[in-house]
Amino acid sequence: NSWEEIQRMQRDYPDVDIAVLKQPGKGKGDAVHHAFQQAKGDILMILDGDLTVPPEDMIKFYNVLASGVGEFVNGTRLVYGMEKNAMRFLNYHANRTFALIFSYLLNQQFTDTLCGTKVMFRSDYEKILANKSFFGDFDPFGDFDFIFGAVKLHLKVVEVPVRYRARTYGSTQISRFRHGFMLLKMVIFAFKKLKAI
């Protein structure tokens, strides 16, 4: 029902410049890449539509980029406390574990590699896209496309803590075990690319 809801929002707010796009493929990663290629600004932002991260937090991400403190800004949900039921117990510990693993593999500190909230310059996004083939094309969410790409380009990576809330809209499309297995495959692939002799 998301498509109808988005169209309704566009009709209800005619004074706001809302672009409505339909992705050609499937998955969040495909949707983000499609939207970024249509976007007009010099700064590109990802904010998940389930409102687990307040839209008001995006100003903090913008300020990090605009001030030159960082060139790739990644959200982290695991610094502040979070609302009850915002993240399942198993997901919480899996997120922490994957953050430690990818921090080691990438030689870059991450506390939350799977937070959907990310901000970057368009020019850096275009470079990340051009280098995407180095790490393959099997990330359905796009998080690792951006993280791997940013680290490979030696961008200044900064994490911004967000207050993670229980979702107020929609239902999760993430399968813990199927997508968890996919993440394990990414770990092995990244190890071979980055650490194996």
Q: Over which residues does each language-model region extend?
A:
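Conserved residues at the C-terminal ends of beta-strands
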Residues: 47, 76, 163
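Acidic donor-binding/catalytic loop of UDP-sugar-dependent glycosyltransferases
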Residues: 1-5, 47-64
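Cofactor-binding loops of NAD(P)H-dependent oxidoreductases
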Residues: 21-24, 47-49, 160
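Hydrophobic helical membrane-anchoring modules
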Residues: 11, 60, 66, 131-197
